[in-house]
Amino acid sequence: MKLGIYQLVTSLGIKKQEGISALQSVLVLIFLAIIGKKRVSKGETIKYYGIAAIAGFSKMPSKSYLHKFLDLITVSCGENFQIVSAKAFKKMGIFKGKIINLDGHFIAYFGKSKIGKDKHPTRNISMGGIKAFFSQDQETGNPIFARVAYPRKGLTPENVTIPMLQIVKDILPEMEKVVFDKWFSVGSLLEYLDKKMNLKYVTLIKLYENRIEEMKSIPTEEFRPLIGSDRLIAFKDTTLRNFSGGMKLIVVRFFEDGIEKYYGYLTNDYESSEEQILDEKSWRWRIENFFKNCDFLGMDALPSIELNKIAGMLAMKIFSFNLVACLRKDLGGEFEKMTVESIFEEIIEFPALVKTNGDKIVVTFYGNYKDSHKAAVQKLLKKFDETGMNAPISWMGDRRIELKFK
């Protein structure tokens, strides 16, 4: 309720429908993700109807209805839902907003319909699928905004990144630095970030032969030990095609099986130490961990090959992730570091009796719960009561939730 769920749903731009409201449909899609039902068709297999009840239904809507609802969401409205949601989540304190990770993610399609192809990151083959690009708050690991597109030749680092970062900047005006992989190390893009958006960047360099020779040209005495490793580090000024002026090239030298090797990073950050910049670059792997954590939510389970349905479903999955992030933050302690799946197992996956009693919805847990589960849920509800967040829920007959453990 504190997120302003009605305003969020309005941002989808769906006209008022007879019967089932857009709000109820959105709630079902969000809750299905949170309980690990990766596809809308899995909703029909749920035997416990608490999910339906909390969305205001007597039973789960059919998969055909949910697909029809997704058909109503345009790509732009799905993205607008993400933007409005991210701004609401920012107020909840789940973003730090200074350093942003940006990365691409390939969602493979195994059906028979024709769809654009791209190289699969692990199978080393070209196959049909969807390109998704995600921005992530580096310090918290929470997603900010994502965009999907069909693979095509016109999809470049510049036309993907600039519009996305402009949106992220609108959500997080305090953004200072973006960290990404070597696909993004393109002069025209880095020029725009440096000169037009006043952003710092850190990117892994493409190891072309001329770059390797440039790294080898650094005198040995300029290398120093990289603390905490058996590697050496140095830096020099360098240039990049389509970038006006110079930038810093940070070089790491190491030996592997007796062979001298190098890798390097490009950055326009002359204020931070080279070690700090490498540390920030290493945290880019948080976005890889995010992709793994999202398997539970079904981020890669395409609802269709239609881009509008994919964008709509993606918006719901990102909302689900950040909703759980708010829950982790409110619970505190050991729960803050748990994955979405672990939160489900520790907090949500417990059978309970749900009954209405006057102006209350009484949720009663009968054994089989852990003491930590009981303490966490009671702490959470107490916080809701103290802050006024346990407000009457309109789609549940204007009733408040009450918890009991027996």
Describe every region a protein language model picked out.
Residues V28, G43-I46, S62, L66, ...:
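Short, conserved catalytic/metal-binding motifs centered on acidic residues
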Residues G50, L226-K236, S320-K406:
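A short, flexible helix-boundary coil/loop motif
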Residues N198-D295, A352, K379-K406:
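An anionic, glycine-rich sequence signature occurring as long contiguous blocks
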Residues G43, S273-L307, G312, M316, ...:
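Short amphipathic alpha-helical "interface-anchor" segments enriched in bulky aromatics
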Residues V40-A55:
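DNA-recognition alpha helix
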Residues T122-P173:
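Electropositive, glycine- and tryptophan-enriched low-complexity nucleic-acid-binding patches
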Residues M1-I30:
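Basic, short loop/linker segments at the boundary and entry of helix-turn-helix/winged-helix-like folds
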Residues K63-Q136:
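Active-site-proximal, Lys/Arg-enriched surface segment
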